[in-house]
Amino acid sequence: MAASKVKQDMPPPGGYGPIDYKRNLPRRGLSGYSMLAIGIGTLIYGHWSIMKWNRERRRLQIEDFEARIALLPLLQAETDRRTLQMLRENLEEEAIIMKDVPDWKVGESVFHTTRWVPPLIGELYGLRTTEEALHASHGFMWYT
C-alpha cells in the first residue's frame, strides 16, 4: 500500500493581506476637568434656584400670615356669636328640662366668679347629637 501524500494548506500566492491588530478605542468624551466644572456649575445653579424658591415661599408665607391676622377678628367674632347662640339654646333647653325642679336657677354658673369663662365642649354640646360633638372636638381630622 502506498501512503497517500498529505497536502499542506499554504497561503495564497502573494500572501495574506495586512491584519489590523491595533486596539480600536472609542473617543473618551469630556475630560475630567470639564466634567468637574459642569458638576460644580450644576450644583451652583441648583443652590441658586432653591434659594430663589425659598425666598418666594417665605414671601408667600408672610402674605398668608398677614391675611390670617387680618381675618382673625372676623373669625373670632363669628366663633363668639356661634358660642353665644349655642349657650342661649342650651339655656332654653335647660329651662324646659328643669321646669319641674324646685329651687333650680336656669343659667346659674357652676363657677363662683363673675368673670367670663369660655365654655367647655362638653357644656356646649351636652344637649346635642354625638356627631355634632365629635365634629366640634375633632374637626376635619376625619379626612386626613
Swiss-Prot record:
One cellular component (GO) term of this entry: mitochondrion
UniProt-annotated location(s): Mitochondrion inner membrane; Nucleus
Annotated disulfide bonds: none
Region named Important for inducing cell death: 102-144
Transmembrane segments: 30-51
Gene Ontology terms describing biological process: aerobic respiration; cellular response to interferon-beta; cellular response to retinoic acid; extrinsic apoptotic signaling pathway; mitochondrial respiratory chain complex I assembly; negative regulation of DNA-templated transcription; positive regulation of execution phase of apoptosis; positive regulation of protein catabolic process
Known partners and oligomeric status: Complex I is composed of 45 different subunits. Interacts with CARD15, but not with CARD4. Interacts with STAT3, but not with STAT1, STAT2 and STAT5A. Interacts with OLFM4.
Pfam families given in the database record: GRIM-19 (PF06212)
Sorted UniProt keywords: Acetylation, Apoptosis, Disease variant, Electron transport, Host-virus interaction, Membrane, Mitochondrion, Mitochondrion inner membrane, Nucleus, Primary mitochondrial disease, Respiratory chain, Transmembrane, Transmembrane helix, Transport
Tissue specificity statement from the Swiss-Prot or TrEMBL entry: Widely expressed, with highest expression in heart, skeletal muscle, liver, kidney and placenta. In intestinal mucosa, down-regulated in areas involved in Crohn disease and ulcerative colitis.
A GO MF term: endopeptidase activator activity
The protein's name: NADH dehydrogenase [ubiquinone] 1 alpha subcomplex subunit 13
Source organism: Homo sapiens (Human)
Membrane protein topology class: Single-pass membrane protein
Biological function: Accessory subunit of the mitochondrial membrane respiratory chain NADH dehydrogenase (Complex I), that is believed not to be involved in catalysis. Complex I functions in the transfer of electrons from NADH to the respiratory chain. The immediate electron acceptor for the enzyme is believed to be ubiquinone. Involved in the interferon/all-trans-retinoic acid (IFN/RA) induced cell death. This apoptotic activity is inhibited by interaction with viral IRF1. Prevents the transactivation of STAT3 target genes.
UniProt entry tagged with the keyword Nucleus: yes
Regulation: induction: By IFNB1/IFN-beta combined with all-trans-retinoic acid (ATRA).
Modified residues annotated as N-acetylalanine in this record: A2
Disease note: Hurthle cell thyroid carcinoma: A rare type of thyroid cancer accounting for only about 3-10% of all differentiated thyroid cancers. These neoplasms are considered a variant of follicular carcinoma of the thyroid and are referred to as follicular carcinoma, oxyphilic type.
Superkingdom of the organism of origin: Eukaryota
